Amino acid sequence: MRFEGTDSYVATPDLMLAVNAAITLQRPLLIKGEPGTGKTMLAEEVAGALGIPLLQWHIKSTTKAQQGLYEYDAVSRLRDSQLGDEKVKDISNYIVKGVLWQAFEQGRPSVILIDEVDKADIEFPNDLLRELDRMEFHVYETRQTIRADVRPIVIITSNNEKELPDAFLRRCFFHYIKFPDKETMRRIVDVHFPRLKQDLLREAMEVFFELREVPGMKKKPSTSELIDCLKLLVAEDIPPEALRSKDRKTVVPPLAGALLKNEQDVHLFERLVFMARHNR
């Protein structure tokens, strides 16, 4: 079982190598990189390319590791017992299977996405060490042990909001998705806009990469934001020359909102555009 990329996702050779290394080693693949570099989409593409199910677990600040295994709905059972419902006699009626349980009982290969693991409490990764290592866990309420007959491919993403525990890192294969260079970015854009006018793409790309290099930029625009910007330019039929117009009044209104996401960067962008145009 090897991942060779897909037509809808530009995977660099080193990224494909990382995916296949994790599969060979039977270890979780920990993916880091700037927001918008395709970390989450990678799991979807791996599952699609290999023709296997994808089970997604999107982590929040309140997420607990137990939720990935199962949850026992004691409140519903208490309510049903008060109503005299017969199903209270079978405690399994109140067990809600988590993503890991669902993957373990597939009986065939699958992909588990644990998305943005760094959003959770610092102990969250450690609480999953045994389960991800042994691919099994115990259900105390029913006295079952749930084991994976076929080991799933586990892809874990992180935006580096907090450091992950060393014990967790030792059990993962790590890959950092570098921000795409101009050539790779063109390939990514071609996937989304195969018939885009090259002069418009060239101007938009220049503005995009210039913005990323501006000193003092609080949040650099990402790949997904470039795609949004191009969608707006195409939808509004904006000519390429409008991106370089010396008339400040013709600055494309959607452009700043697609690429820049806070007022400090917007004001910085406006000042730089104004100065650059009047120095030409």
Q: Positions of the model-derived regions?
A:
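C-terminal regulatory/interaction module of P-loop NTP-utilizing enzymes
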Residues: 1-280
